[in-house]
C-alpha cells in the first residue's frame, strides 16, 4: 500500500471520521446556542512570549498529539512535539484502511514508523484503532466471505496487530465509535451484522487483552459532551459490555467540541463518566471556531466565537482536572498546531483562519491555550 498523499493534495483519507455526506457530524449541536461571554474563562488572553510554555509541564497527565509519517521529517513539527508532548497517537497509520489489504494481508510498516519515532523521542504511544466501522475493512464486506472465516480473520487481525506491539503501547482504542449518530442506540455495521451487536465488541476486547495483557484497553467515541443522550448511551454500553466480560479498562472521549454547547454539558458528562471508576482519555480534542467547519452561515464576530471557544475549552480542562489522578489517562489534541489540524488542511474546507487547537502556526499559545493553562493551574477567572 502506498504512502498517503500530502494533505495539501488530497485529504479524503485523512478524515478522523468516516464522513461521506456534506455535513460534518463533529459539529452537530446537541443543545441550543449558549453564548459564553459571561463565563469566567471568556477573558483569557493569548499567552505572552514567542513560544508557549510546554504543555507537558502544565497538563496534570500525559499530554499527547497525533502524528503521521509525512510529518516525521518536518523539523519544526518535531521540535514542537519534543517541547510539548509525552504521548503520540498515530492519526491514520493504524486504521484498517492502511494496515489490511486484499486477501487479508497485513502491512504495518507505516504504523511501525510512527511508533518508532515516538520511541526514539521518549514518547509513549496510544494505539488508534483496532476496530472501526469506517475507513477500511472492505475485504470483510465481501459477500462471499463465509461467516466462519469472517470470525477467524477478525480475531487473527486483532491478535496480530495488538500482539505486534506487545508491551509497547500505553493503551489501545479497541473499538471506535460504536454508538449511533444521534445517540439513541448502537451503530449497525459489518462487524455487528456478522458477529452480533455486543458480540463483536466483547470479542475484540478479549482478543486484544490476550495479545497484550499490560496495555489499557479503551472504548472511544465522539460527541459525548455535545449530545447528552449519546453520552448516556455510551456509558450504559460500557457497563453492559463489562458485565458481558469485555475487559474495558478506559473511556475515550474524542472531544471534537462544538463551542456552542451549553455551559455545564461537559462537566456533567465527565462527572457521569468518572462514576464508572475507569481512566478517561480526552483523545482527539479540537474546537473549530466555525459552524460545521465553515459550511453553515455564521454571523458571529470573531470576538464572540473566541469567547465561546475559550469558555468551552476551559470547562473541559477543569472537568478533566477535577478527575481523581488515577482516572486522568491523557489529554490529547487532534493536531498540535493549527496548521496540523485536519480542520485546516481538509480538501474543500481548508480554513487557514480557523484556530481549532491550542498552538498557533508559530507554536505560540492561543486564547484556548491560556484557558487550559488557567484551568490546570487554578487561575481560571483570575
Predicted features along the sequence, with ranges:
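Conserved, mostly hydrophobic/aromatic
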Residues: 88, 118, 172, 251, ...
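N-terminal secretory signal peptides and thylakoid transit peptides that target proteins
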Residues: 21-39
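Secretory targeting signals
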Residues: 1-9, 16, 21-23
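Glycoside hydrolase catalytic-domain groove-lining segments
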Residues: 198-203, 212-216, 231-233, 240-296, ...
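Aromatic-rich peripheral "rim/lid" segments of glycoside hydrolase catalytic domains that contact
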Residues: 173, 177-194, 265-272, 285-382
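Acidic-and-aromatic substrate-binding clefts and catalytic sites of carbohydrate-active enzymes
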Residues: 66-77, 96-109, 179-181, 224-233, ...
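C-terminal segment of N-terminal export signals and the immediately downstream linker at the start
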Residues: 21-22, 39-66
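Substrate-binding cleft and catalytic face of glycoside hydrolase catalytic domains
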Residues: 89-93, 99, 113-194, 198-216, ...
Amino acid at each position: 500500500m502506498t504512502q498517503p498523499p500530502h494533505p495539501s493534495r488530497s485529504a479524503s483519507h485523512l478524515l478522523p471520521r468516516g464522513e461521506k455526506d456534506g455535513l460534518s457530524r463533529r459539529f452537530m449541536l446537541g443543545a441550543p446556542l449558549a453564548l459564553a461571554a459571561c463565563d469566567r474563562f471568556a477573558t483569557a488572553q493569548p499567552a505572552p512570549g514567542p513560544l508557549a510554555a510546554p504543555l507537558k509541564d502544565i497538563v496534570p497527565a500525559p499530554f499527547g498529539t497525533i502524528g503521521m509519517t509525512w510529518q516525521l521529517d518536518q523539523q519544526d513539527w518535531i521540535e514542537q512535539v519534543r517541547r510539548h508532548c509525552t504521548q503520540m497517537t498515530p492519526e491514520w497509520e493504524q486504521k484498517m484502511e492502511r494496515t489490511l489489504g486484499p486477501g487479508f494481508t497485513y502491512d504495518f510498516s507505516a504504523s511501525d514508523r510512527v511508533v518508532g519515532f515516538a520511541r526514539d523521542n521518549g514518547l509513549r504511544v496510544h494505539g488508534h484503532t483496532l476496530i472501526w466501522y469506517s475507513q477500511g475493512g472492505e475485504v470483510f464486506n465481501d459477500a462471499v466471505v463465509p461467516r466462519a472465516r469472517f470470525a477467524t480473520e477478525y480475531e487473527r487481525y486483532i491478535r496480530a496487530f495488538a500482539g505486534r506491539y506487545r508491551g509497547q503501547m500505553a493503551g489501545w482504542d479497541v473499538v471506535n465509535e460504536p454508538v449511533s449518530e444521534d445517540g439513541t442506540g448502537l451503530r449497525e455495521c459489518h462487524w455487528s451484522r456478522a458477529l452480533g451487536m455486543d458480540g463483536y465488541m466483547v470479542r475484540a476486547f478479549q482478543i486484544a487483552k490476550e495479545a497484550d495483557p499490560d496495555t489499557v484497553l479503551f472504548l472511544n467515541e465522539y460527541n459525548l459532551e455535545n449530545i447528552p443522550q449519546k453520552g448516556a448511551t455510551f456509558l450504559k454500553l460500557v457497563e453492559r459490555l463489562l458485565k458481558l466480560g469485555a475487559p474495558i479498562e478506559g473511556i475515550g472521549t474524542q472531544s471534537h467540541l462544538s463551542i456552542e454547547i451549553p455551559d455545564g454539558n461537559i462537566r456533567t458528562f465527565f462527572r457521569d463518566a468518572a462514576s464508572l471508576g475507569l481512566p478517561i482519555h480526552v483523545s482527539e480534542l479540537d474546537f473549530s471556531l466555525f459552524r460545521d467547519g465553515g459550511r453553515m452561515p455564521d454571523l458571529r464576530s470573531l470576538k464572540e466565537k473566541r469567547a465561546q471557544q475559550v469558555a468551552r475549552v476551559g470547562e473541559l480542562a477543569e472537568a478533566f482536572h477535577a478527575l481523581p489522578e488515577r482516572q486522568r489517562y491523557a489529554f490529547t489534541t487532534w493536531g498540535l498546531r493549527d496548521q496540523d489540524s485536519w480542520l485546516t488542511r481538509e480538501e474543500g474546507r481548508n480554513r487557514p483562519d480557523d484556530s481549532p487547537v491550542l498552538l498557533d502556526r508559530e507554536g505560540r499559545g492561543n486564547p484556548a491555550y491560556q484557558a487550559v493553562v488557567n484551568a490546570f493551574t487554578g487561575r481560571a477567572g483570575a
